Amino acid sequence: GRYKNQDIICYPDASGRAMKTSAATGTTDFSILRNAGFKVLARSKQPPLVDSVNAVNALLKDAKGNTRLYFNKEKTPRTIASVETTTWKEGFTTGMDNAIIDKSKGVEHFSDGVRYICEFLYPIGKHKPQIIRDRTWSF
């Protein structure tokens, strides 16, 4: 196949360590991914939601106006739509420690995935960056 000798890296949220969707098999979601040959990189616990949203925003455009995160319009239209339409739950703002993403529209799944990889590689907050070299990302 086209990607035969390539590593596929997954950046899921920390809840995959728990026996949730895979409880019937007695393994974790992470174990299922690893057993299928995927490399799994995730934090031991979720960072504050605001930090992960800020990590994405900083890659989309930092304080100096630099952009390091791009989306291919032809290949990722649902991801773009998700990032553009995911909002904070009413009554919560980005400055609040207990901010919540509004999941009532059902559009946040793709933007959640973008948050997980961006926060893991380019964290805002307590965690140290997991990158070895600086690069521009595109989806």
Task: Kindly label every feature range from the protein language model.
Residues I132:
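Phosphate-handling catalytic cores of nucleic-acid transaction enzymes
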Residues G1-A99, I124-G125, T136-F139:
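Mg2+-dependent endonuclease catalytic cores in nucleic-acid-processing enzymes, primarily RNase H-like
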